[in-house]
Amino acid sequence: MALNLEQKKAMVAEITDIANQAVSAVAADYRGLTVSEMSDLRKSAREARVHMRVYRNTLARRAFKETTYACLEEVLTGPIVLFFSQEEPGAAARLIEKFIKEHERLEVKGLALGGELLPAEKLKAVARLPSREEALSQLAAVLLAPVTKLVRTLNEPIAQVARVMAAVRDQKAA
């Protein structure tokens, strides 16, 4: 399907807008996937709140020049599907890692995180990044640990006195 100049400009603006809102991106070669497998992948992407779309590589390159994903330009060859994580850096990587376990034909070409191009081998590492809620709970646990330890330390002398008094009471009762 041929696109006119206005449609191409709109597509570049759309890609730029999506890329500017994204926290990470993944480019993958979808050669060999059936229509039903692509539909399943799209459905999973919607559920994971990951933007997934096939764009023309030339339009994606043009759009990426204005974003932090310019590093992805070198992997935009052949049939490429782009995944953009809007909220969590590891969301797209988790989605793809799970999909690859079932359908080995999806081949990751590269990941972009923080304006850096990461090789496909880093997919598992990025997928293991904690979600926002997990990261916040880990941070809360780290911040609360010293306070909890202090409270236990302050309560220990009182608890010792209580144990001694209980032992004396039990000894007198016997």
Curated annotation (Swiss-Prot):
Pfam families: Ribosomal_L10
Coiled-coil annotated residue ranges, if any: none
Any one GO CC term of the record: cytosolic large ribosomal subunit
GO BP: any one term: translation
Biological role stated in the UniProt entry: Forms part of the ribosomal stalk, playing a central role in the interaction of the ribosome with GTP-bound translation factors.
Subunit organization: Part of the ribosomal stalk of the 50S ribosomal subunit. The N-terminus interacts with L11 and the large rRNA to form the base of the stalk. The C-terminus forms an elongated spine to which L12 dimers bind in a sequential fashion forming a multimeric L10(L12)X complex.
Family in the record: Belongs to the universal ribosomal protein uL10 family.
Family annotation (HAMAP family): Ribosomal_uL10
Name the record gives this protein: Large ribosomal subunit protein uL10
UniProt gene name: rplJ
